[in-house]
Swiss-Prot record:
It comes from Chlamydomonas reinhardtii. The lineage of its organism: Eukaryota, Viridiplantae, Chlorophyta, core chlorophytes, Chlorophyceae. This is ATP synthase gamma chain, chloroplastic. CDD domains: F1-ATPase_gamma. Disulfide bonds join C233-C239. PANTHER family: ATP SYNTHASE GAMMA CHAIN, ATP SYNTHASE GAMMA CHAIN, CHLOROPLASTIC. Pfam families: ATP-synt. InterPro entries: ATP_synth_F1_ATPase_gsu, ATP_synth_F1_gsu, ATP_synth_F1_gsu_CS. One of its GO terms (cellular component) is proton-transporting ATP synthase complex.
Length: 358
């Protein structure tokens, strides 16, 4: 037994014991080695092809991330000027009670969750993180006795929640390759219709906030109602906000008018006091708030897309690195088996020559 183990070890490590082996055993061993070499060679070729695909996907995702970032930057002038106008109008109505259907606070019996996921996979845990965040918020709200409806943006989220009967999906949207104002407006119209018709008493957005190429954070943000207060409680004094909710604050602080987490540093100036509005400032505010909401949704879509592309780029980069390591290991294994095959053939030749001369 010890001699047999030593013989096998010598064959695989490229060391031959030069002991003659029976022809039948040597023949079967040769066939097994040849079959093993072909299998390893095929695996190496498969890994190489996979690496080419992951490298290409990484480059495509990197290029798209840059375009997504540029889209956010290009939209800033519009957002900045809109904030300036909103600031000026808010100055006119801040002493008055803003009577807007989008600011109406009522008892929260139904919440609409707008969930932003991707249309495709191969992006690491991006979609899974958003889905888990939504499920946790769903359980939290249902434990309070609140009815929850879903609006799914992105096929992955829609497919996941559609397979589970406890979730009620009222509408689904496709994210698309590049978010547009038309897509954001379509989502905003669905949200407004649900809120104004009192089908939903509160609307929350669940999306991934883009921080950097290697970091993103699933976030819950209250969209409606838009209130001049921080924590949102209904008329019965019941607060249903998430612990990490980012609430839209209709306020002005140091000349700023935006969602607090964005920490906007836009320099705004009050409108000229002599400026005369054709409509009441409250009416203008009612017209501007939906526009501002659409721009917020568009920016959220852009951030979600940038987060998805960054996650895909990192996932494909890790896949490429793993493919390189796997290819390296398979190459070493192939060389060892090839060396063992050559050593075995030499041993057979030497054994045959010794038997013939004997």
């Amino acid at each position: 037994m010890a001699a047999m183990l030593a013989s096998k070890q010598g064959a695989f490590m490229g060391r031959s014991s030069f002991a003659p082996a029976p022809k039948g055993v040597a023949s079967r061993g040769s066939l097994q080695v040849v079959a093993g070499l072909k299998e390893v060679r095929d695996r190496i070729a498969s890994v190489k092809n996979t690496q080419k695909i992951t490298d290409a996907m990484k480059l495509v995702a990197a290029a798209k991330v840059r375009r997504a970032q540029e889209a956010v930057v290009n939209g800033r002038p519009f957002s900045e000027n809109l904030v300036k106008v909103l600031y000026g109008v808010n100055q006119r109505v801040r002493q008055e009670d803003v009577d807007s259907p989008l600011c109406a606070v009522r008892p929260v019996k139904s919440v609409l969750l707008v969930v932003l996921t991707g249309d495709r996979g191969l992006c690491g845990g991006y979609n899974n993180f958003i889905i888990k965040k939504t499920e946790a918020r769903y359980r939290e709200l249902t434990a309070m006795g609140v009815k929850v409806n879903l609006v799914c943006v992105g096929r992955k989220g829609a497919q996941y929640f559609a397979r589970r009967k406890q979730y009620n999906i009222v509408k689904s949207f496709s994210l698309g390759a590049a978010p547009s104002t038309k897509e954001a407006q379509g989502i905003a119209d669905e949200i407004f219709a649900s809120f104004i018709a009192q089908e939903s008493d509160k609307v929350e957005l669940v999306f991934t906030k883009f921080i950097s190429l290697i970091n993103s954070n699933p976030t819950i943000q209250t969209l409606l109602p838009m209130t001049p207060m921080g924590e949102l409680c209904d008329v019965d004094g019941k607060c249903v906000d998430a612990a990490d909710d980012e609430i839209f604050k209709l306020t002005t602080k140091g000349g700023e008018f935006a969602v607090e987490r964005e920490k906007t540093t836009i320099e705004t100036e009050a409108l000229d006091p002599s400026l005369i509005f054709e409509q009441e400032p409250a009416q203008i505010l009612d017209a501007l708030l939906p526009l501002y909401m659409s721009s917020c949704l568009l920016r959220s879509l852009q951030e979600a897309l940038a987060s998805e592309l960054a996650a895909r780029m990192n996932a494909m980069n890790n896949a490429s690195d793993n493919a390189k390591e796997l290819k390296k290991g398979l190459t070493v294994q192939y060389n060892k088996q090839r060396q063992a095959k050559i050593t075995q053939e030499l041993a057979e030749i030497v054994g045959g020559a010794a038997a013939t001369s004997g």
